Amino acid sequence: MLPELLSFVVREGVLERSRALSVFGVDELCEALHRELGYDFFRGNRRRMLRLLIDLLVERGWLEPTRSGDRWSCRRDGIPLPGESPAGATEGDGQVDFFRRCLRLVPGYLRGEEAPIAFDAENVRVWEEFLGCDEFQACRSVLLDRMASTSGASASLLDLCYGPGWGIERAMDRWPEARITAIDFTDVFAANAKCRAERGHARNAVRGRPSSPVEWFGPSDWKGFGYPLPFPEGAFEAVLFSCGDPYIRPDARDAVYADLRRVLAPDGTLGILTRGYPDPEHRHVPSHWLRVTALIHDFTESVCAGWHGFPDVGENQAMFSRLGFRGAWNPGGAMNIMDSALWILKKR
């Protein structure tokens, strides 16, 4: 995906305008791209998308920051280095295919078109394949295995924003004795998720393992982030929250996670699958390629309705501590691993 995104930067003329400005800040580049390319930075997350591009180009050495850190100069002429040139369309997994689909929609979106991908019936298959990609499935397994070691195999589990049901299926495999409750603010995925739950029950029955029915909650019970969950205090020993965090509005993050803490039992466990925004110090997201992947992911999924992006890892840590969580990955109390992609938190 990196070659394709860099090709977009050259093809659209973003790099050319950056070079023409010599040294520039975000405001100057926004003005130039609005004037010359028709980009609309006055609505939604489009201005943030430009900052994502800048950070990606810095990461790859195409732009160089000044000492102040908020202005840049162009170091490249757009001629690709080895590994930066598109090699033609190759078959990818659900994640790569999703990024490509989104990237094709970026030019129109930057010029003011409405977000073309939403959590609706038209895009069920798109989300099905993306959220079920190999990387996310492997991460769910790691997350659930570690959560089980801290919560016990018979925990009551809430799957927040269950989507197509990939997390439910993994949870039933990893935690066969768990009492699972699933909730989402849309019911467009309900049929697929319930099919996965039924398959999970069938597999557990063949293996002679107990498996409780899933309890389902939908948009008539919960309207989404910013609304309280319809459960009493301390209702669950564990909460699984995979791939939904970037859809929380920045001004609602404290309230959303405070409510998750409310529904957790004392010493309950919260497991989160997301990505962390690459920090300039390379402390929270040190791996170059994971940094590049996070920026590509954040930029491309920005064309999806409701996307607010990956949060700052340090701000996340401070928020969780302030709200009454502690890290639970190891005896040292780390909150996250894998360059801040997997989080396990305990309710203090």
What are these model-derived regions, one by one?
Residues 134-153:
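Conserved alpha-helix/loop element of class I SAM-dependent methyltransferases that forms part
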Residues 153-163:
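Conserved class I S-adenosyl-L-methionine
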Residues 254-266:
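A short glycine-rich, Lys/Arg-flanked "PGG" loop and its adjoining helix->strand segment in the class I
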Residues 273-322, 330:
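C-terminal alpha-helical "lid/dimerization" subdomain adjacent to the S-adenosyl-L-methionine
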Residues 237-252:
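A short SAM/SAH-binding and catalytic strip from SAM-dependent methyltransferases
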Residues 158, 168, 173-227:
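Class I SAM-dependent methyltransferase SAM/SAH-binding core
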Residues 1-105:
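N-terminal accessory segments
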Residues 226-239:
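A short acidic, Gly/Pro-enriched loop at the edge of an enzyme's catalytic core
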